[in-house]
């Protein structure tokens, strides 16, 4: 029986600052059946696209992407923060409220032409996922889709990833 995954998301008012509602996926991850169903829905989306590699940004993109990669029998490549990868990397910058941040991937993480699904827990402004897509494309990969557990529609992150088939299991 399909679960209503919204029942497994904690909403914390005024966190991390006044006026913000933080959507916490920890209860979903803590419940085996809810986590399985969320993963299975993303796996089905990926199967329909012939995905050959999953890429997820640090750190919650790992939580979403790794079980999907396992179920599909494909690899997982992390997009990490500065100083976390030991070999030669490519870099993509993205905007924060005050300044910029960067993500990195190993230069051999994705093969040219490889069909990639980019995963993360949350689509907010689209900055992190946009940088992750940029990294995959720098390496010659083909982003065939993006998948999220939650999308915060008021932040218009989908506008930054127009042209990419996108799945959000829940929208707030």
UniProtKB/Swiss-Prot annotation:
Quaternary structure and partners: Homodimer.
Protein name, as recorded: Adenine phosphoribosyltransferase
Gene: apt
Lineage: Bacteria, Bacillati, Bacillota, Bacilli, Lactobacillales
UniProt xrefs under CDD domains: PRTases_typeI (cd06223)
BP GO terms, sorted: adenine salvage; AMP salvage; purine ribonucleoside salvage
Subcellular location: Cytoplasm
Classification via Pfam families: Pribosyltran
GO CC, alphabetical: cytoplasm
SUPFAM superfamilies for this protein: PRTase-like
InterPro entries: Ade_phspho_trans, PRibTrfase_dom, PRTase-like, UPRTase/APRTase
Molecular functions (GO terms): adenine binding; adenine phosphoribosyltransferase activity; AMP binding
Gene3D superfamilies on file: 3.40.50.2020
EC number: 2.4.2.7
NCBIfam families per UniProt: apt, PRK02304.1-2, PRK02304.1-3, PRK02304.1-5
Keywords: Cytoplasm, Glycosyltransferase, Purine salvage, Transferase
Function, in words: Catalyzes a salvage reaction resulting in the formation of AMP, that is energically less costly than de novo synthesis.
Pathway: Purine metabolism; AMP biosynthesis via salvage pathway; AMP from adenine: step 1/1
Catalytic reaction(s) noted: AMP + diphosphate = 5-phospho-alpha-D-ribose 1-diphosphate + adenine
Chief location: cytoplasm
Family: Belongs to the purine/pyrimidine phosphoribosyltransferase family.
